[in-house]
């Protein structure tokens, strides 16, 4: 079979092309129509819950100006029991500054000044606080080996458990756990000489 012959038509002139509007597909029109619709919200939000109590006095209503529903009063929130299983917040960020200049003798209790966690990020770290030591607060800490609660420095062993300074250093030096016969109620401290002032 021979292929069918088609009749060739001449190309249109430039003026006819310039005068005719370009033919667009319906999808292009739909896209342009939807592109410039500002009054429609493209996001669909789920309906917000309404907190409203008809028995409550009108003066105690809490209203969020940015939302169109009522917020419950903080006094109406359920109180969590003391047996709740939520973990406590870590104490890693809480810091204190130990000031040795405030202590007069060894028998007096050491003075502590509460320190805000924004102290380090404020850039004033080396300004007025030069002579003060920064220590982490560890409350209710107990040595995992000798069960003491007082030490000059808390350290972590290889498993990550807290140990007192003496038990940890003894194990690092001798590679043997510290005998409980060496454990004392109060850690021993050195008697340091006072620097002579002229």
UniProtKB/Swiss-Prot annotation:
Main function: Transcriptional activator that binds to the consensus sequence 5'-[AT]GATA[AG]-3'. Required for gut-specific differentiation, specifically acting with the GATA region-binding transcription factor elt-2 to control normal gene expression and promote normal formation of the intestine. May have a protective role in response to infection by Gram-negative bacteria such as P.aeruginosa.
Matching InterPro entries: Transcription_factor_GATA (IPR039355), Znf_GATA (IPR000679), Znf_NHR/GATA (IPR013088)
Induction: Induced by P.aeruginosa infection.
Name of the molecule in the record: Transcription factor elt-7
Region feature Disordered, mapped onto this chain: 1-20
GO molecular function terms noted in the UniProt entry: DNA-binding transcription factor activity, RNA polymerase II-specific; RNA polymerase II cis-regulatory region sequence-specific DNA binding; zinc ion binding
Pfam family membership, one: GATA
GO terms under cellular component: nucleus
Keywords: Activator, Differentiation, DNA-binding, Metal-binding, Nucleus, Transcription, Transcription regulation, Zinc, Zinc-finger
Disulfide bridge partners, by residue number: none
PANTHER family from the UniProt entry: TRANSCRIPTION FACTOR ELT-1-RELATED (PTHR10071:SF328), TRANSCRIPTION FACTOR GATA FAMILY MEMBER (PTHR10071)
Gene3D superfamilies, alphabetized: Erythroid Transcription Factor GATA-1, subunit A
GO biological process, one term: defense response to Gram-negative bacterium
ZnF GATA-type: positions: 143-167
Knockout consequences: No obvious phenotype. RNAi-mediated knockdown results in no obvious phenotype. Following infection with P.aeruginosa, RNAi-mediated knockdown results in reduced survival and slight intestinal distension. Double mutation with elt-2 results in arrest at the L1 stage of larval development, reduced expression of gut-specific genes and a severe disruption to normal gut differentiation with the absence of birefringent and rhabditin granules, which are characteristic of normal gut differentiation, largely at the regions of the cell that interface with the pharyngeal and rectal valves.
Gene: elt-7
Coiled coil: none
Record's compositionally biased regions (Polar residues): 1-18
Subcellular localization, as worded in the UniProt entry: Nucleus
């Amino acid at each position: 079979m021979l292929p069918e012959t088609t009749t060739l038509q001449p190309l249109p002139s430039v003026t006819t092309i310039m005068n005719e509007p370009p033919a667009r597909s319906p999808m292009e029109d739909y896209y342009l129509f939807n592109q410039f619709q500002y009054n429609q919200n493209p996001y669909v939000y789920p309906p917000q819950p309404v907190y409203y109590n008809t028995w409550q006095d009108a003066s105690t209503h809490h209203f969020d100006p940015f939302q169109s529903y009522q917020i419950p009063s903080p006094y109406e929130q359920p109180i969590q029991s003391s047996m709740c299983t939520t973990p406590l917040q870590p104490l890693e960020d809480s810091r204190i500054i130990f000031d040795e200049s405030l202590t007069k003798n060894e028998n007096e209790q050491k003075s502590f000044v509460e320190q805000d966690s924004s102290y380090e990020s404020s850039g004033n770290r080396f300004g007025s606080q030069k002579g003060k030591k920064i220590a982490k607060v560890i409350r209710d800490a107990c040595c995992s080996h000798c069960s003491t609660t007082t030490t000059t420095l808390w350290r972590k062993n290889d498993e990550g458990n807290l140990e007192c300074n003496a038990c940890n250093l003894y194990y690092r030096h001798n590679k043997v756990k510290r005998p409980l016969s060496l454990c004392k109620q109060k850690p021993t401290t050195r008697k340091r000489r006072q620097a002579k002032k002229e």
